[in-house]
Amino acid sequence: MNKWKVRRAPAGVQRQEDHREEYERDRARVIHSSAFRRLQAKTQILGVLEGDFHRTRLTHSMEVAQIGRGLVLNLQKKFPELNDLLPRLEQIETTGLAHDLGHPPFGHGGETALNCAMADYGGFEGNGQTLRILTLLESHSPENGLDLTRRTLLGVLKYPVPYANLCKTSSPDATDKSAKLNFQQTWQPPKCFLDTEQEVFNWIVAPLSNTDQLHFCEYTRPTTQSHG
């Protein structure tokens, strides 16, 4: 099997009678997941003078999936000689549908508050939580979450560096009044995956050469005042 279509669960655990294409199965698993349904209760943007219905994370994710599909169709028409390098339509749609699953209510303010609350337990970051939901927390499989294909997980993985490597080196003091006044700036997390998903990340990038992995994971080192 194509190394990018492999799943983490042993082959014996997977349904042998399911004849759908691998990325079609990924798409179905995301759409039927609890995490995807929860997006309807999370506001994406409070649009002024746009009517009574605000854009939610769910409608935003559907729009992202549609735009991604349109981009691939456009590239297929313009560069037919590169079609073998382009993602399948189902795969790019799945990436769009799943990309915000880990983001909490109240946008980046909610993310910052959770990072503060979880400071002693590895912190919190919405994109990292997305990977955790997809690979562990969702209930499709006992140990692998939705057990999506490697390529789909790579597409969802936005920031290929763990939290600990990027977090600024000075820890905020929760009793510091200035830290409370500048809460968003003080506790905003780095863009990363969570340290707990290091093993999952290693599996995702395993097909890449050592050189490609080094280039893929390059980052600016953090300072006492700013994240990497």
Model feature map: region roles:
Residues 1-19, 31-42, 62-94, 104-228:
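Sequence-structural signature of the catalytic-core scaffold of metal-dependent phosphohydrolases
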Residues 42-52:
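A short small-residue
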Residues 51-55, 80-83:
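Short, surface-exposed loop/turn segments at secondary-structure junctions
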Residues 57, 61:
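Aromatic-acidic/polar surface patches that form glycan- and anion
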